[in-house]
């Protein structure tokens, strides 16, 4: 999906997956294996994975919504504010993990629906995110990678609030975050858990859930986020202000 409409697309290297796996999990970065209900350890450089005991266990087009909250292009001030809030704490170790140049290879541009679908497909083809534990650091590394390699301004990767499945706010990004159950016995396996990337990533979530990235091709056809949670788009939702604020309050989501 997405290939026929593109003239040319760059090829993210498989190294992106390795760098994301190393982030927060050290040499023990891993993937959630749904079929096994457990943890798969990635051995750097080998391209192989080794099973370990579980430690954690209607279609729509872009113009179909009159009130679809398409992002207003960010101002330079907003871009700088984003960088200060989200990128300043990315240290030299993160630069090494990302493995890209300090400057973008192409002119900066805003993410579009078509680009989001294409990037989602490319990353899937490379095995980059499926089953990978989510963490704030991996989130930032992905932002940096796409900014430097593709020139995509890193203001697009946001997800709905929990509990439960977190859907991408940007229509066209086909990766959602799905909570996985951590078996109680796994939490008692001290040696593995202290090294296990998921034991770090769950603390990145205010609801304490351990999340993994999961590819969902239907997100290219249905704006699930806007259908289920229009209140999260605030003034851009098309709802009366009192209504969307009431819904956010009922869900315990802060708003201004």
From Swiss-Prot:
Segments traversing the membrane: none
Bilayer topology term: Lipid-anchor
Subcellular location per the Swiss-Prot or TrEMBL entry: Host cell membrane
Gene Ontology cellular component terms for the protein in this record: host cell plasma membrane; membrane
Family per similarity comment: Belongs to the lentivirus primate group Nef protein family.
Lipidated positions per record (N-myristoyl glycine): 2
Region ranges (Acidic): 88-96
Complex formation: Homodimer. Interacts with host CD247/TCRZ; this interaction induces down-regulation of cell surface TCR/CD3 complexes.
Listed Acidic residues bias regions: 88-97
GO molecular function term, any single one: GTP binding
Motif PxxP, residue range(s) on this chain: 104-107
Domain remarks: The N-terminal domain is composed of the N-myristoyl glycine and of a cluster of positively charged amino acids. It is required for inner plasma membrane targeting of Nef and virion incorporation, and thereby for infectivity.
UniProt main location, coarse: host cell
Described function: Factor of infectivity and pathogenicity, required for optimal virus replication. Alters numerous pathways of T-lymphocyte function and down-regulates immunity surface molecules in order to evade host defense and increase viral infectivity. Alters the functionality of other immunity cells, like dendritic cells, monocytes/macrophages and NK cells. One of the earliest and most abundantly expressed viral proteins.
Region (Disordered): 33-100
Keywords: AIDS, Host cell membrane, Host membrane, Host-virus interaction, Lipoprotein, Membrane, Myristate, Viral immunoevasion, Virulence
Protein name: Protein Nef
Region (Mediates dimerization): 140-156
InterPro entries, A to Z: HIV-1_Nef_core_sf (IPR027481), HIV_Nef (IPR001558)
